[in-house]
Amino acid sequence: MIMQLQEQRYYSPEEYLELEVNSEIRHEYIDGQIIPMTGGTPNHNQLALNLSGTLNFLLKRQPYRVFITDQRLWIPKRRIYTYPDVMVVQTPLEYQEGRKDTLVNPVMIAEVLSKSTKSYDRDEKFAAYRTISSFCEYILIDQYTMHVEHYCKTDNNKWIFSEYDDGDVTLNLAAVPCQVLLADIYDQVDFSVEE
């Protein structure tokens, strides 16, 4: 998603959640700041849909749930509410205390990179996600060319980085028992369309 900074007023998490319930658009909450999330491009949406649909199909009747863009995640150690493009959670779902609309236990997250958010997604957002104990896999998908960055956490809490740019390559996921062909992630994506 594309982020836009809003005025520098600081909000409590409770104020944010109250505003978010009545809002027509989604917002991220980052340690007191509320940041509107604008709509994505057709390529952005297609990539998120392709990955989530593939994962949802491959994980049927297994103890995982796949969520796309509208599912809120709370990162308590960083005081961040965010909406990952694709998020996989092992069941049972764990919710933020006192809420039934905000999850806290993803095992895998994927973000589709845009020009305005790619640095944030690679750096600050990834650092925030790494504070979640259940989180062990991160996928960054480029919407302008076939290129995927893949991070997997090892048993000794080190992260292994791999990158792929060939449609015939299979992405072997560590957090969930499945493999995804890069060509399936990029199906119907038109690189000739600019943001």
Stretches with model-predicted labels:
Residues 1-195:
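Gly/Pro/Ser/Thr-rich low-complexity, intrinsically disordered segments predominantly at protein N-termini
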